[in-house]
């Protein structure tokens, strides 16, 4: 069946035809039948260079040999035990070894589950209610954080979701990213702050980087006020450095969440933090968290192989991706400048995004002012030329270890044509 026929069929049994909002784009999304390395193939047999990469999960590329071998071996032993396994402890030790801020780890399944638990831990630890989040930061689709969120929520213009409880969201205070004064004023006005949660690099409102001293000032202020600081490293964990953004910036949070690149494409997440906080989790403590699939041996085997591969490659991996990103982003900037197209390019590590605006993009408000229609034109032209990026300016373009210089050159040629379509 073709993409169009499959989508018509899907809409009959799946709301809007997709299982996550940002996967939809007009007139219909393509349906993937297989993937390998840096490429995916749709049901119409088009080969696409993949820069969506599972929205950042596939740091090592599709079907990475080390991970496939590890998972295949585990499949012969079973898929779900619902008992402790040796692999869970091995994985926890690997995570702790890469993240010095973490004393103990609890495994889960999704990024949203991890942030939900992190917030519950902060409330249990402080015995307070209110959480501070930043505009445009996306921490999953649960009520506590689905307020002025990024990702698909921003793309679809949903500031607060229908069905969410005001009684829950009223305990979420929203401040502007990269604005320390706004944070200080909010803390001064509210004495019931249980925690502050932040994406250290904002990767769900396009790509927005923390300004100089923002994260260090954030850490200082939360310490001075005895407020737990939660780093949501669901995207940045392992992607920007083996120890995530906290290694990259030299900041130690109290609680960390991670997922995505943790397992390179398998459903697993983790919450880690200081011993005195983590020991509050049940059954030893009174902060409840549970899941049938938490620590399942398939995902654990993938995560162990992923971290071991990352640790083995380390400088070689990250220096390659940073070099590719610098070359690509610089060339893209030159192209758009030569064409006279107002734009901003934000990039770091293995992530970048172009915004069609003449003003720096440093927060939620400036991101929303970028020309979304021009971005959609860019996206469609790239797709026609065999390049797949996320279909929203509020997402990020992700490089993987599977990408080659030839892939980048082909992609730059496609971006050149796409920018021409934007200009016209």
UniProtKB/Swiss-Prot annotation:
The keyword Cell membrane does not apply. Its cofactor is pyridoxal 5'-phosphate. Gene3D superfamilies: Aspartate Aminotransferase, domain 1, Type I PLP-dependent aspartate aminotransferase-like (Major domain). Its EC number is 5.4.3.8. It is an enzyme of class 5 (isomerase). Its main location: cytoplasm. One of its GO terms (cellular component) is cytoplasm. Pathway: Porphyrin-containing compound metabolism; protoporphyrin-IX biosynthesis; 5-aminolevulinate from L-glutamyl-tRNA(Glu): step 2/2. InterPro entries: 4pyrrol_synth_GluAld_NH2Trfase, Aminotrans_3, Aminotrans_3_PPA_site, PyrdxlP-dep_Trfase, PyrdxlP-dep_Trfase_major, PyrdxlP-dep_Trfase_small. Disulfide bonds: none annotated. It catalyses: (S)-4-amino-5-oxopentanoate = 5-aminolevulinate. Keywords: Cytoplasm, Isomerase, Porphyrin biosynthesis, Pyridoxal phosphate. The keyword Secreted does not apply. GO terms for molecular function: glutamate-1-semialdehyde 2,1-aminomutase activity; pyridoxal phosphate binding; transaminase activity. It is found in: Cytoplasm. One of its GO terms (biological process) is protoporphyrinogen IX biosynthetic process. HAMAP family: HemL_aminotrans_3. Belongs to the class-III pyridoxal-phosphate-dependent aminotransferase family. HemL subfamily. This is Glutamate-1-semialdehyde 2,1-aminomutase. The gene is hemL.
